[in-house]
């Protein structure tokens, strides 16, 4: 995905929701994505797809498409590829959902083992663990799940049981939209493939942020 001004390019692993990295050039984006393969293998393992993922040896560019202004600004995928727009079979949908669930499980594991205080930036800024967790969950709840009709009270995600119930409802809503052939959202219409990979990316990006800023061993 190439930003309209060419400032940022995002490499997206279309078969592996959540694995996408941005950089200033296409080659740098691909190399950055490859550098995260070992980290993503932990997600694939949770999804019981580790052997399939670890068997990948080459990165092939199958499509180049235009991004949005946000692509250039954030270095994050904000546009739909032709693959995102392809129809999914029931089995393909379940594979995507299984990987998104694995991203959630990885996120939950990370937030339980990292330090509450996170390493600050060079100017002393940055969020601590609880703020990162709150942001990640709230954004998914209010921006992504809402697009498939899942409306949840703000405090419902504060307990393990509430979080599980919310995620189960989110999964089921995506299945329902898929069965009806519907796109996510009332105004901005998102293909379900994109909704899943964007939510998975957001979850993983903040899980990796917490790992990178963890002060447990320092």
What are the roles of these predicted feature ranges?
Residues 2-6, 13, 69, 73-80, ...:
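N-proximal short alpha-helices
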Residues 1-49, 97, 108, 112-164, ...:
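Short, contiguous alpha-helical
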Residues 54-60, 114, 181, 188:
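Generic structural motif recognizing short loop/turn segments at the entrances and edges of beta-strands
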Residues 172-183:
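Transmembrane alpha-helical segments of integral membrane proteins
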Residues 99-110, 165-173:
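Amphipathic alpha-helical packing segments from all-alpha helical-bundle domains
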Residues 38-92:
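Short, charged, surface-exposed hinge/linker loops at domain edges
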């Amino acid at each position: 995905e190439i930003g309209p001004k060419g400032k940022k390019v995002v490499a997206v692993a279309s078969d592996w929701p959540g694995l996408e990295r941005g950089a200033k050039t296409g080659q740098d984006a691909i190399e950055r994505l490859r550098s995260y393969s070992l980290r993503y293998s932990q997600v694939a393992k949770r999804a019981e797809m580790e052997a399939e993922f670890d068997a990948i040896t080459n990165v092939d560019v199958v499509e180049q498409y235009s991004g949005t202004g946000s692509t250039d600004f954030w270095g994050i995928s904000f546009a739909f590829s032709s693959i995102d727009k392809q129809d999914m079979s029931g089995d393909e949908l379940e594979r995507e959902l299984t990987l998104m669930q694995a991203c959630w499980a990885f996120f939950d594991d990370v937030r339980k083992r990292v330090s509450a205080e996170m390493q600050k930036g060079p100017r002393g800024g940055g969020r601590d663990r609880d703020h990162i967790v709150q942001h990640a969950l709230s954004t998914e709840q209010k921006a992504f799940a809402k697009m498939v009709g899942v409306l949840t009270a703000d405090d419902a995600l504060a307990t393990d049981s509430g979080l599980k119930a919310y995620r189960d409802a989110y999964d089921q809503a995506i299945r329902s939209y898929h069965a009806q052939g519907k796109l996510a959202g009332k105004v901005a219409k998102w293909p379900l493939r994109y909704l899943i990979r964007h939510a998975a990316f957001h979850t993983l990006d903040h899980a990796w942020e917490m790992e990178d800023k963890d002060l447990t061993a320092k």
